[in-house]
């Protein structure tokens, strides 16, 4: 049994569809014409969208004004599109009694089903099913297709639940800059400036960088890459653990 609680009905502007429109209106189910649906913007998504048309189905194959693609935008994930086409049985008359005409009729209907199935497939629908039944005045074609939920994991995982997830990838770790504050009170700046100064003579001073800590990774590269508050400002580029000698006579 179909749940009509979140359903939109799209109908063509013809007499049989007008009768359907009245029935759906009595059930308080929203309806809209195919022409209005193409022109207007819908501000809601639906679990089910029904489309009815009598005789005409060419608009479903129009690539310049793709109604199947627009319908998909207003379907919820895993929502169902239900297309119902009523086609006149031109071969079902008093003069038609040959097997050849009946066979031609079946081929025409199968080609229509094949084309519409392809269009649904090309527009990204999945679980497409087709069915044809014979009515009093012709043939009824029914096509059901589902709007896929391929992006479910992306939509659900946009929010970060813990700090560890921020640093999950190595690339992200490289982008994180954790600088020392100028007015540091937590001891991080003091730890970062833990350079062992060894005076060789009056002209030279040597710094041991064995215990050097660089939060941003730029401290080792030289003044051109260091921030204004870098504790190693003035020292040449060095490798961690390397002893750095400064000539005090050079201005």
Curated annotation (Swiss-Prot):
Show the segment(s) annotated as N-terminal SAM-like domain.
1-154
Q: Which domain of life is it from?
A: Eukaryota
Q: Which residues bind [4Fe-4S] cluster?
A: 216, 219, 227, 230
Q: What is the residue range of the motif Cx2C motif 1?
A: 216-219
Q: Under the GO molecular function aspect, what terms does this record hold? A: 2 iron, 2 sulfur cluster binding; 4 iron, 4 sulfur cluster binding; electron transfer activity; metal ion binding
Q: What does this protein do?
A: Component of the cytosolic iron-sulfur (Fe-S) protein assembly (CIA) machinery. Required for the maturation of extramitochondrial Fe-S proteins. Part of an electron transfer chain functioning in an early step of cytosolic Fe-S biogenesis, facilitating the de novo assembly of a [4Fe-4S] cluster on the cytosolic Fe-S scaffold complex. Electrons are transferred from NADPH via a FAD- and FMN-containing diflavin oxidoreductase.
Q: Which family does it belong to?
A: Belongs to the anamorsin family.
Protein name per UniProt: Anamorsin homolog
Q: Name one GO cellular component term.
A: mitochondrial intermembrane space
| Location in or out of the cell | Cytoplasm; Mitochondrion intermembrane space
Residue ranges of region Linker?
Answer: 155-167
User: Which intervals of the chain are annotated as region Fe-S binding site B?
Assistant: 216-230
Residues engaged in binding [2Fe-2S] cluster: 170, 181, 184, 186
The domain-related comment in the record is: The C-terminal domain binds 2 Fe-S clusters but is otherwise mostly in an intrinsically disordered conformation.
Q: Which cofactor does the UniProt annotation name?
A: [2Fe-2S] cluster; [4Fe-4S] cluster
Record Pfam families: CIAPIN1
Record's keyword terms, sorted? 2Fe-2S, 4Fe-4S, Cytoplasm, Iron, Iron-sulfur, Metal-binding, Mitochondrion
Q: Report the InterPro entries cross-referenced here.
A: Anamorsin, CIAPIN1
């Amino acid at each position: 049994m179909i749940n009509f609680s979140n359903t939109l009905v799209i109908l063509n502007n013809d007499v049989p569809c007008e009768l359907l429109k009245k029935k759906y209106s009595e059930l308080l189910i929203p309806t809209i014409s195919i022409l209005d649906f193409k022109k207007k913007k819908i501000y809601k998504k639906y679990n089910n969208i029904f489309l009815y048309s009598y005789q005409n189905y060419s608009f479903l194959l129009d690539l310049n004004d793709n109604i199947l693609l627009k319908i998909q935008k207003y379907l919820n994930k895993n929502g169902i599109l239900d297309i119902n086409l009523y086609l006149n049985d031109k071969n079902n008359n008093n003069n038609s009694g040959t097997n050849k005409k009946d066979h031609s009729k079946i081929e025409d209907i199968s080609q229509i089903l094949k084309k519409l199935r392809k269009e649904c497939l090309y527009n990204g629908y999945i679980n497409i099913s087709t069915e044809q039944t014979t009515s009093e005045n012709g043939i009824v074609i029914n096509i059901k297709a589902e709007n896929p939920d391929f992006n479910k994991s992306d939509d659900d995982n946009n929010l970060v639940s813990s700090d560890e997830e921020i640093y999950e990838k190595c690339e992200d770790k490289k982008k994180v800059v954790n600088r020392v504050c100028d007015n540091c009170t937590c001891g991080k700046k003091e730890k970062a400036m833990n350079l062992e100064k060894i005076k060789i003579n009056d002209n030279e001073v040597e710094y041991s960088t064995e215990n050097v800590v660089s939060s941003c990774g730029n401290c080792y590269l030289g003044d051109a890459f260091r921030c204004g508050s870098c504790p190693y400002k003035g020292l040449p580029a060095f490798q961690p653990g390397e002893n750095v000698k400064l000539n005090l006579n050079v201005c």
